[in-house]
Swiss-Prot record:
Binds 1 Mg(2+) ion per subunit. May bind a second metal ion at a regulatory site, or after substrate binding. NCBIfam families: PRK00203.1. This is Ribonuclease H. The gene is rnhA. Its main location: cytoplasm. The keyword Nuclease applies.
Amino acid sequence: MQEVELFTDGGCRGNPGPGGWGALLRFGGVEKELKGAELDTTNNRMELTAAIEGLKALKRPCKVTLTTDSQYVKNGITQWMTNWKKNNWKTAAKKPVKNKDLWQALDEALQPHDVTWAWVKGHSGHDENERVDELANQAMDELTG
C-alpha cells in the first residue's frame, strides 16, 4: 500500500458565513494541493470537507497519515462515530448528529484506506498546517472577491 501524508484545514469568516478548505497530499516526494470554498457554511463543515476531498483525491487504497488541527474531526472519527452509527446517527444525548451528511461522506471516503489520525495545534508554526490554512483562505478570497 502506498504511504500518503494528508494535511487538512478549514475555516470560515463568520460562523456561519463564507468558508474555505485546503488539503495537501504528499506521496513519494510529490505534493498535490487542493482547495475549495462555499458561500454559506461553518468552520466544522469546512474542516470535514477538507478531509473528505483529500481522501477522495486518492485513486487507490493507501496507508494515510491524516493531520488536522480540528479536534472535532479527529474526535468524531476516532471516538464518537462508532456510537453515532450504532444509535442511528444520534448523539449520546439522543439528538441528531450535526453535519451527518458530511460525517457519512467521510466515513465512506475512509473505507478503502488504512488511516492514522494525527492532531496538530493550529497556528503553531507547523509548516503543512500553515500551508493548508493559506489554501483555505485563498479559496475564500477567490469566492468572495
